[in-house]
Amino acid sequence: IGRRLLVRGRAIARPGIKIDINLERPKSLGTVRLASSDPLVSPLIDPNYLSDQQDIDHMVKGVRVMSEIMSRPEIAQYHQGSLGPWKNVTSDAEIISAIRATAYTGHHPACSVRMGTNNDKMAVLDNQLRVKGVEGLRVCDASAMPSQITGNLYATVIAIAEKAADMILGKKPLPAEYPEEKINA
């Protein structure tokens, strides 16, 4: 409960409760494509949010759980109900419409230039973070992740950058702390 409620980035001058439902590992995949061979031209980015039915199903379930919690007498006494597109929403179709009207990114894009094996057709980077087919170019940020992590990207991106620095400098990896033969013995 706060002094100002933020709705789609705008402050509403009254107390309120804001609840976010997050898909930490969405199935929907977007695309980043070159618009031109000119490096100064912005790429074509399509995040393709909520394109996978499983993502929609999880969001609807999250809304239903949140609604059930907020309708409990212990909490309901502190609020007057939902606002905007969420007011009087009950059916799955209404929930999906409200989700599509209010969904936004968590601003943690990742996996758009993912690392993978030579057999992985979706992988842009090899296991040394080098762009396949391009000499002298590596990527060492969240886009190199093969799959989305659950949680904030910051520490993982630092680890990727540290590993990339070691690769560029030609440092050998540290030996395994627990070699497999000792684990299985």
Task: Please name every model-derived segment.
Residues 1-156, 164-185:
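FAD-dependent oxidoreductase catalytic-site/capping-region signature
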